[in-house]
Structures are given as C-alpha cells and as structure tokens.
Amino acid sequence: MHYLNISFSHKNSTLDVREKLSYKDDYATKGCLSKLNSGESINESILISTCNRMEVFCSCSDIASATKHIFEMLAARSGVSIDELEGRADIFDDSSAIHHLFSVASSLDSMVIGETQIAGQLKDAFRFSYDNGFCSQKLARAMHHAFKCAAKVRNATDISSKPVSIASVAVSKLKSVLDNVEGKKALVIGVGEMSEITAKHLLSSGADVYITNRTKHKAEKLASECGAKVLDMQDLHKAVNEFEILFTATSSSEPIITDEIIKPCDFDRYWFDMAVPRDINYHKGDRINLYVVDDLKNIVDQNMSFREDGARKAHGIIGRSTVEFFEWLNTLNIEPMIKEIYEKAFEAARIESQRVIKKGFIPKEYEDQIHKMSQQVLKRFLHQMSSKMRSVSEESKADMLTSAVQFLIEKDQRDIPDKYKCEHALNIIEGR
C-alpha cells in the first residue's frame, strides 16, 4: 500500500488553472471521488478543493498507475492538457505524501502561514469522503495523525497566536488603500466562513456592512450573528454601483458580477474577489479597483517574515511527526504477524500432541498437561523473538523485517493493515 498526493496550489498553479480544477459543490466532488476510486490501483481517496489549492490524496497499490489515472481524469474534466498538469503539479508519495499532508494541516503550506481555515477545510474534505464511502482506515489513520500534528504545531509555536486568514488579509489590504473605512458602505456576498470573517473584520473597523446571498434566510442568520444588515440578492445590480466596498466569496460556478450590471460611477470602488472560480468578470469601469486572491501576496509575504521563527520550529515538528506516523504503522504490521506466529506454533503443538497420544507414546489422561507444557515451551522460545520484532518496528530496517516474516508465514502484505481497526478513525468521526 502506498500514499500518493497530487497537489495544485498557489505555489505552482495560476488562478486560471486552479479555477478549472476546482470542485464547487458536493455533487461534483462525489463524481470526482467516484472516478478516482474507479482506478484499478486506487482504493481510497480524498479531494481537497479550496481557493488556494486542489489536491488529491489517496492510497494506492501502484503509484505510477494511480498517478496516470488521476492526471487523465483531471485533464478530461478541466480541459488542461496532461503535459501542463504534470508540469505544474507537486507529486508526493509515501513519506513525502504524509509530510506534505501534515504541512497542509498545520497551515505551513498555506498562502497565509498560521491561518486557521485550512484545518477545518481538511476535516470537511475527510468527513465527506469517509461518510460517502470513498475512504476508510488507510486514509483515516493519516488524517488523524495530521490533525494531531497540527495541534502540536499550534501549541508549540506562535504561528497561530494571532489568527489570520485570507479574509483578514483582504481587509488589511483594503485598509492599506483606504485611509478610513469607518462609516463606508460595504457589501459582503456569500455566507461561508470567509464571508463571516470578512464581515466581522469590517464591522470591527466601523464599516456599514450588508450581507447578501442567493438563499436569503442564510444571509439573515449571518447578519443577525454579526450585527450586519441584509441586502436582497435581487438588488445586487444596484448595489455594485452604490457601494464603495465589496467582498465576494461564493461557490457559484459562473461569475455573478459582469459587465451587464456595472455602470460608471463618480467614486472609486474597491472590490475583493476571494472566490475560485472567480465571482467577478468585467471589462469596463475605470474607477474599479479589483483584487483577487493572488493579489494579496505582498501582505502574505509580510506575514511570513513575522512568523519565520515559528515556521522553522513547525517544520521540525512535522518532520518528527512523519517519522512517528510510520513507526506507528510498522507496529500495526508487527503485532498481527506475532499473533499469527503464535497461532501457527500452538496449532503445530496441538497436532503433534494428539499424534503421540494416538500412537500410545503418552497416556491419554496426560493430554491436558502435554498441551500446556508444549505451549509453555513455545512461549519461552518465541518470547525473545517477538520482543525483538516489536523493538525493531521503530527502526529503519522494519520494512525489510516485516517483508521477510510475511514471506515466511505466507501472508499477503495487503491484508495486514486493514485487519486491525484504527482506534483513532472513529474518534475523528465522533469528534466532529
């Protein structure tokens, strides 16, 4: 069994490419996961699709075959050639895949280092795949350790001491271009976590905030929680020409603000499009200042410089957590093998005991004593060997040892991990 992660992120792909690779709703995500798992060598998969990344994390029996299947599937859906996808993607397998997963969960791979949204997005992606039967024990183990690693990073470093997000960075950008936002009318489109954070930051800065959404009662609920006002989505065509400030982060697959509804204004407008695919597509409007996710990089770089020390410490934690994860996986392989060795030895002792009794070498009335004695002999003989097997599970040569023992006891390696329940998998689900 192998782990494989194919990653398209803000580090290797343009916004245009990420838009084409994005999956905006549950229906599309389910279709993608179904096609992923239809690959001959892929047995479990998780799809992570956010404004800054699209990643496939899977377990597979053959890395080359699984990689080929994933690229063919993504190319067919997105219209981006396989050559371009291969040129852009970061491909991680086995230990590097786990290391990358832990980095993503700990927000070390985020555009905004230390942002807290990615952990929730990762949990949502895992739950969706798990609840719909697209992943099970193999990925659940990795995800559980990823969340544990993220918690260690948060507790041991200061990278999340001042929580930041793309939304808070966008509001910071607004403040850098506008001297004062107090009293200015600001429209927030959408009701997701990013919209909520944006609305709260704008309100705390004194802006007059309105929230709108296709589903009005959701806008009313968020506005009530934040202390904002509600704007009917049907009035969006008026609002874009009346409001000075606009933030949008919807899950629409098509732009919702286009040339058709934009009119000339005698004041500057500041629009922030944090959606992928983008919500705004226009070709006119001289006094419109539009910022998309990738335009926030300057502030992000400043954020990174503030958190460099914490990030270095976090990388060390992630490295150690990766090693500990594979040591733990090795113990899952070792214990079943030790159990099977004992079972085979006891069965051989039982057969031999019955044989000598049947031949009359030992009286029948001593049968129980013979069984106990033979088992005690075997336990004494196997104890030292099993102790060494357990101790070596934390060493680099563990893989060689487990392969050799699997060969000797004629056990299929693919059977072993799934035979033993991961006690953490249910905890992840129950801890939602």
UniProtKB/Swiss-Prot annotation:
| Active site per the UniProt annotation | C51
Q: What is its EC number?
A: 1.2.1.70
Q: What GO molecular functions are on record for this protein?
A: glutamyl-tRNA reductase activity; NADP binding
SUPFAM superfamilies named among the record's database cross-references: Glutamyl tRNA-reductase catalytic, N-terminal domain, Glutamyl tRNA-reductase dimerization domain, NAD(P)-binding Rossmann-fold domains
List positions binding NADP(+): G190, V191, G192, E193, M194, S195
Q: Which residues bind substrate?
A: T50, C51, N52, R53, S110, E115, T116, Q117, Q121
A biological process from GO: protoporphyrinogen IX biosynthetic process from glutamate
Q: Where is this site: Important for activity?
A: H100
Q: Identify the CDD domains for this entry.
A: NAD_bind_Glutamyl_tRNA_reduct (cd05213)
Task: Give the pathway listed in the UniProt entry for this protein.
Answer: Porphyrin-containing compound metabolism; protoporphyrin-IX biosynthesis; 5-aminolevulinate from L-glutamyl-tRNA(Glu): step 1/2
Q: Which InterPro entries match?
A: 4pyrrol_synth_GluRdtase, 4pyrrol_synth_GluRdtase_dimer, 4pyrrol_synth_GluRdtase_N, GluRdtase_CS, GluRdtase_dimer_dom_sf, GluRdtase_N_sf, NAD(P)-bd_dom_sf, Shikm_DH/Glu-tRNA_Rdtase
Q: Which reaction does it catalyse?
A: (S)-4-amino-5-oxopentanoate + tRNA(Glu) + NADP(+) = L-glutamyl-tRNA(Glu) + NADPH + H(+)
Q: Which UniProt keywords apply?
A: NADP, Oxidoreductase, Porphyrin biosynthesis
* Function as written in the Swiss-Prot or TrEMBL entry: Catalyzes the NADPH-dependent reduction of glutamyl-tRNA(Glu) to glutamate 1-semialdehyde (GSA).
Domain comment text? Answer: Possesses an unusual extended V-shaped dimeric structure with each monomer consisting of three distinct domains arranged along a curved 'spinal' alpha-helix. The N-terminal catalytic domain specifically recognizes the glutamate moiety of the substrate. The second domain is the NADPH-binding domain, and the third C-terminal domain is responsible for dimerization.
User: What is noted besides the main data?
Assistant: During catalysis, the active site Cys acts as a nucleophile attacking the alpha-carbonyl group of tRNA-bound glutamate with the formation of a thioester intermediate between enzyme and glutamate, and the concomitant release of tRNA(Glu). The thioester intermediate is finally reduced by direct hydride transfer from NADPH, to form the product GSA.
**Hey, which family's this protein in?**
Belongs to the glutamyl-tRNA reductase family.
Q: How does it assemble?
A: Homodimer.
This chain belongs to which protein, by name?
Answer: Glutamyl-tRNA reductase
